[in-house]
Amino acid sequence: MYQIGEALIGEGNEVAHIDLLIGDKNGPVGIAFANGMTQLSMGHTPLLAVVRPNLIPKPATLIVPKVTVKNMGQAAQIFGPAQAAVAKAVADAVEEGVVPKDLCEDVVIIVSVFIHPEAQDPTKIYKYNYGATKLALTRAMEKFPGVDKVTYEKDRGVHAIMGYKITRLWDAPYLQIAIDAPDLGVVERVLKNVPKNDHLIIEAGTPLIKRYGLSVISKIREIRKDAFIVADLKTLDTGNLEARMAADNLADAVVCSGLAPIATIEKFIEEARKVGIYSIIDTLNVENPAKLIAALKVKPDIVELHRGIDTESQSAEHAWGNIPEIKKAAGGKKLLVAVAGGVKVENVETALKGGADILVVGRSITNAKDIEGESRRFLQAMKKDEIDQYRIMTDF
């Protein structure tokens, strides 16, 4: 046996965070247990859990302090409420059948315990560590979480210390607001007025980047640190280099022109994948987007069907094309399709029914007197609830 469990319970300085291993005495957990008892580390001295002096729980449990113990007051918290809490949690877990009794002499447990240096309340330390240890042990025995649970939760939660969530594009449709005006004042005004929403993307447009460089991405990030930011470079050469530059400047996605050589596009996609950002192929002036995608050995994450600003005055039709055909050309890879040019509140439903995943809107929002109101009109037309808007949860 080699099982792993984790749990966080409580609040304030007494919060308990438990990392736990349970495994066979003659396996790696047993070896680690013996090493912990015989190879001591200053400030992190392992100790056996005891229900009370002279009474260890079964399975035998070793406590390892995560935070350096610097004085006798902190030592008393580990050798007092934390030690008792962990031991009692293990003993109760056996009594309740979480750990089968017939395993108790064959396995050992290692529990890594967090005690904040400013923790004060011994009752909270006990209660929180008891609950967290018992929960971590239960999760270890149940092999929680399963892969499906992790997949479901990974893009929903916010890490407590980080404090905000970096958006990934898994819950289409999305509204992408393109800021093309090469004016930092406009950028700031737009960013401060667009609503916070799980289905909103910010695009640093090509003219904006040409004036200020990719460092403008970092400026956008300063104002909206949790935003999903697209760098519209319209790369035509050195695809791998420009994709890496966008990632280094904190972009979440980067755009390559579909008019670039195939080799450039493929290097661009590979580099974007390597650095963990989305690759977007802009098909402005590409005659057959589906044919282009089919020709690529590696497929992008997003294809943008784009009618340019300069053709709007000519009453050109939008370039949305046959979206299902483009997705089919990806050969089974999950492909998002963005539509840009001619997107209005009135045709949002038509675009979505046609298969669009991302609606790119520029001046209709960025030039509006009521930026927030206009943004909300598009979001409402998309008829998409916020992620977990109606979910009431503790940890799950």
UniProtKB/Swiss-Prot annotation:
Residues 1-161 are annotated as: Formaldehyde-activating enzyme. Pfam families: Fae, OMPdecase. It catalyses: 5,6,7,8-tetrahydromethanopterin + formaldehyde = 5,10-methylenetetrahydromethanopterin + H2O; D-ribulose 5-phosphate + formaldehyde = D-arabino-hex-3-ulose 6-phosphate. It is an enzyme of class 4 (lyase). The active site is at residue 17. Pathway: Carbohydrate biosynthesis; D-ribose 5-phosphate biosynthesis. The keyword Isomerase does not apply. Its EC number is 4.2.1.147, 4.1.2.43. Gene3D superfamilies: Aldolase class I, Formaldehyde-activating enzyme. It comes from the Archaea. Residues 162-396 are annotated as: 3-hexulose-6-phosphate synthase. One of its GO terms (biological process) is L-ascorbic acid catabolic process. One of its GO terms (molecular function) is hydro-lyase activity. Substrate binds at residues 19, 48, 66, 68, 83. Keywords: Carbohydrate metabolism, Lyase, Multifunctional enzyme. Catalyzes the condensation of formaldehyde with tetrahydromethanopterin (H(4)MPT) to 5,10-methylenetetrahydromethanopterin. Catalyzes the reversible formation of ribulose-5-phosphate and formaldehyde from 3-hexulose-6-phosphate. In the N-terminal section; belongs to the formaldehyde-activating enzyme family. This is Bifunctional enzyme Fae/Hps. It comes from Methanocella arvoryzae (strain DSM 22066 / NBRC 105507 / MRE50). The gene is fae-hps.
